[in-house]
């Protein structure tokens, strides 16, 4: 759980950078930031335990995949709004993970 929270923290920071790069028209850096975000989302998906997690894990995987798809769109369309959408989804998920951590820790 600690690793998930660390990944989420890095992901949210990198999403902010990607958004800033779009607004600043720094397209090469935008691409690097979005690629880092996608790598982190893929790592989060890889960490899911599909054998034991049931429907919750399947839904998390779908949410992560949706975020990856939206980031590809954000990159191609230079859309800070799509990055904002991803940040909103992920901030809600992060709150859930933090709440779980508080109950377990």
What are the language-model segments listed below?
Residues 1-17, 22-24, 28-35, 42, ...:
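N-terminal intrinsically disordered, cationic/polar leader segments
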């Amino acid at each position: 759980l600690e690793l998930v929270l660390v990944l989420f923290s890095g992901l949210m920071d990198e999403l902010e950078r990607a958004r800033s790069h779009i607004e600043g028209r720094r397209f090469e850096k935008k691409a690097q930031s979005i690629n880092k975000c996608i790598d982190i989302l893929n790592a989060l998906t890889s960490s899911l335990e599909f054998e034991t997690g049931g429907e919750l894990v399947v839904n998390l995987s779908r949410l992560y995949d949706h975020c990856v798809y939206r980031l590809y769109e954000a990159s191609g369309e230079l859309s800070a709004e799509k990055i904002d959408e991803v940040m909103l989804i992920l901030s809600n998920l992060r709150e859930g993970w933090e709440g779980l951590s508080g109950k377990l820790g």
